[in-house]
Curated annotation (Swiss-Prot):
It comes from Pseudarthrobacter chlorophenolicus (strain ATCC 700700 / DSM 12829 / CIP 107037 / JCM 12360 / KCTC 9906 / NCIMB 13794 / A6). One of its GO terms (cellular component) is HslUV protease complex. Keywords: ATP-binding, Chaperone, Metal-binding, Nucleotide-binding, Zinc. The keyword tRNA-binding does not apply. This is ATP-dependent Clp protease ATP-binding subunit ClpX.
Amino acid sequence: MARIGESTDLLKCSFCGKSQKQVRKLIAGPGVYICDECIELCNEIIEEELAEVADLGSFELPKPREIFDFLQEYVIGQEPAKRSLAVAVYNHYKRIQAGHAPKSGNLGDGGHHDDVEIAKSNILLIGPTGCGKTYLAQTLARRLNVPFAVADATALTEAGYVGEDVENILLKLIQAADYDVKKAEQGIIYIDEIDKISRKSENPSITRDVSGEGVQQALLKILEGTVASVPPQGGRKHPHQEFIQIDTTNVLFIVAGAFAGLEEIIGSRSGRKGIGFGAPLNEASKKADSYGEVMPEDLLKFGLIPEFIGRLPVITTVSNLDRDALIQILSTPKNALVKQYQKMFQIDGVELVFDDGALDAIADQALERGTGARGLRAILEEVLLPVMFDLPSREDVASVVITEDVVLRGAEPTMIPHVTKRRKSA
């Protein structure tokens, strides 16, 4: 309340500074005033914060079996990797939900684990190129409806050197979340080519390894969980710019790489070395299986530092795709490549048909090139380019048939014209 003789015009909101005449209502407290506009703003802030916690608590986390079944619809093969990823992702988001849930004593043992903090379990994905590592992670993020960012480890360097700082990875996640930091803090970051930042030798080097061990050291904190300062425009940090603060404690990191040569390290440890004429054949047949036997000590010999390996407790592998798997990838999943091109042709009112021989030939070419599933789209583009160039200019074509000859020998595809009905003569 104002003192006697004090002008009521001097009464102002203690928060926004507006006078009593500028607002609808001014509420007095012990020595302070607050206007109706500030009260409304405070209510909005409280509601937003409560909604964030409520959304996280009410988020219906799919069970591992449901995650696995969803991956089955889009990704061919790699069942062991799907199971490992489904369990790891489920446990990660269950851990986040438990952190936001109210304390309770109904834990089956009298609530004795209320003070236990569950550590984050990041994932290391090992396997040859073109086997679906990136696609697995993308599909997981789509199922969970969380922000997802992909980064390339080869572009990263230690702070102060030419290249990208590790914080730029976090900027990609923030951008994927439309700069909603709270949402980004529960996202997934996929770092590819992680094997390319292995140190040059097993023993620590005297010279500075800015793109190998230096990057591993720089990644340690954000992998474990820290509040990082991210330049909003990317690039290098400088002291006079503003930063976005993001807590990486609940960000799931999936790091992946081909790790070429790791099978030899595993083989030397397990004593599985071939001798004589059968050696190459023996190695080739067991190379895919050897990745599944990887141990932390093998990764240490490969060039990852112990602290980095320790922050990737979940290690899973993917294997090379065989001919049957490549054929299935072309036609079976919900968003199979063949279905995508059929939809594009359908927009022009044309049906696109592949016979079995064509699919077999495309799979064989991908195997010959050694590009795995990644090479399938490139082959399809090469095969369909002449048709996609001419077809929009033609209105007489009803369907296009792609055969084995078209794929292997560059033959012209079969063009089936529209059927025109003849008019009956009078």
